[in-house]
């Protein structure tokens, strides 16, 4: 008789454990989906940042190439050593200024890139902290 009395308790206990396991699995699935969305968002922003940095680099290479070719054409047209010296000094000064500008642009773009790439992670952690506070 004690066996039949134990079975209903086991059934109730097993169903409660089964429900809590299902709830935990549901929470785990929700967290896994959120992490997958975070990874996708970080990947997308990283791709966009890489694209912007590549465009900036190609623009700098193009500007440098045109400056070099222009200098070469002026250099070949020089008629005296003093004119060659003046062309070299002018070219060097322009190249230094151009290099400084390109570094500033790259630095600004890199800073923007880091902010854009960290934005999804920041939002994820802010949401997680808000969820912990409400729980």
From Swiss-Prot:
Record Pfam families: Phasin_2
Domain of life (superkingdom): Bacteria
Record-linked InterPro entries: Phasin (IPR018968)
Keywords: Plasmid
Protein name: Uncharacterized protein y4wP
Native source species: Sinorhizobium fredii (strain NBRC 101917 / NGR234)
């Amino acid at each position: 008789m004690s066996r039949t009395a134990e079975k209903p308790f086991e059934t109730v206990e097993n169903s409660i454990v089964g429900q809590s396991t299902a709830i935990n699995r549901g929470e785990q699935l929700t967290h896994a989906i959120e992490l997958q969305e975070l990874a996708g968002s970080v990947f997308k922003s990283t791709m966009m940042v890489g694209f912007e940095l590549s465009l900036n680099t190609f623009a700098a290479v193009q500007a440098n190439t045109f400056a070099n070719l222009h200098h070469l054409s002026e250099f070949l047209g020089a008629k005296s050593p003093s004119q060659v010296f003046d062309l070299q000094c002018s070219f060097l000064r322009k190249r230094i200024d151009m290099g400084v500008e390109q570094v500033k642009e790259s630095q600004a773009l890199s800073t923007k890139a880091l902010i854009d790439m960290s934005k999804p992670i920041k939002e994820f952690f802010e949401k997680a902290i808000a969820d912990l506070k409400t729980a």
